[in-house]
Regions:
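Serine-esterase "nucleophile elbow" of acetyl-processing enzymes
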Residues: 1-59, 69-78
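Cell-envelope and extracellular/periplasmic
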Residues: 9, 13-14, 23, 56-61, ...
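A short acidic, helix-capping loop that chelates divalent metal ions and anchors anionic groups
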Residues: 17-19, 64, 91-96, 134-138
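Short glycine-enriched, charge-decorated loop/helix-capping segments at active-site entrances
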Residues: 22-29, 96-103, 140-144, 183-185
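Catalytic-core regions of hydrolytic enzymes
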Residues: 58-80, 97-109
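Active-site segments of SGNH/GDSL-like serine hydrolases
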Residues: 85-91, 114-148
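Charged, glycine-enriched surface loops/patches
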Residues: 102-129, 150-162
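Catalytic His-Asp segment of secreted/periplasmic serine-dependent ester chemistry enzymes
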Residues: 131-213
C-alpha cells in the first residue's frame, strides 16, 4: 500500500477531546486527548506511517452541526474511513427543552449525514451510539432518550451499510464493575480509561470487518 489510509472522526466534545490543545508530534494533525488519539496510536504501531487521521470533533455539536460542517470537515478530504459518534447533545436538547427527537428532526438529519457520506465515498463508515452515565443521578433521566437515539442510529446505519458500535451498555457495564469515577468525571465525558474502552471497541469492530487487515 503506497497511499495513506485517510480516516476522519466526526462528533461532539467526546470526539473533540480538546484536540486543539493537544497538537501531538510536530507536523502531525491535532488529535486531542481522547479515543481518537488512542486509536491513532494503535494504528501507528500496526501501520507505521500509513494512516492520515483527522479529528473532526466539535464541542457542543448536534447531528445538525455535523451536517452543516460535513463538506469542510469530511467530504472535501475524500476519506477512506469515516467514523461518527454523535447524539449526546441532541439528547440534551430534548431534555432541556421538552422537544422530542421527532421535533428536532434527529432521524432525518442523521440519515442525511450518512447519506451524504455514502454518496461521496465507497469507503468504510463506522457509527457509534451515544452514551450517558447515571452519575450524577440526574442523568438517569436521560437514559431513555439516549437509548432511543441509539436505536435510531442503529437502524439508519444498517440502511447505509455502516458498522454500528453501541457504547451505552458497554461503558455502563464496565462502570458498574470498576466504578463510575474511573470512566467519567461528569457523567458525559470520558476519562483516559473510558476513552480506552471506546478505542478498543472501535479497533475490535473494524478488525472484525477486515478494514485494516
Amino acid at each position: 500500500m503506497t497511499d495513506k489510509v485517510k480516516i476522519i472522526f466526526l462528533g461532539d466534545s467526546i470526539t473533540d477531546a480538546d484536540h486543539n490543545l493537544y497538537p501531538g508530534n510536530p507536523g502531525e494533525p491535532c488529535l486531542g486527548d481522547g479515543y481518537v488519539r488512542q486509536i491513532a496510536d494503535i494504528l501507528q504501531l500496526r501501520m507505521p506511517g500509513r494512516t492520515d487521521i483527522r479529528n473532526g470533533g466539535h464541542d457542543g455539536f448536534t447531528v445538525q452541526g455535523l451536517l452543516r460542517m460535513l463538506e469542510h470537515d469530511c467530504l472535501s478530504r475524500r476519506p477512506d474511513v469515516v467514523s461518527v459518534l454523535i447524539g449526546s447533545n441532541d439528547a440534551a436538547v430534548c431534555m432541556n427543552t421538552g422537544r422530542t427527537l421527532e421535533e428536532t428532526y434527529f432521524a432525518e438529519n442523521y440519515r442525511a449525514l450518512l447519506g451524504r457520506v455514502r454518496g461521496a465515498t465507497e469507503g468504510c463508515l463506522v457509527c457509534m451510539g451515544p452514551f450517558i452515565f447515571p452519575q450524577p443521578l440526574e442523568y438517569s433521566r436521560w437514559i431513555p432518550v439516549i437509548q432511543e437515539i441509539e436505536e435510531t442510529e442503529r437502524k439508519i446505519a444498517a440502511e447505509h451499510r455502516a458498522l454500528f458500535i453501541p457504547l451505552h451498555n458497554l461503558l455502563n457495564r464496565d462502570a458498574e464493575r470498576s466504578g463510575y469515577q474511573r470512566l467519567t468525571a461528569d457523567g458525559i465525558h470520558l476519562t483516559r480509561e473510558g476513552a480506552e474502552i471506546v478505542a478498543r471497541a472501535w479497533i475490535q469492530e473494524t478488525d472484525r470487518a477486515g478494514i485494516f487487515i
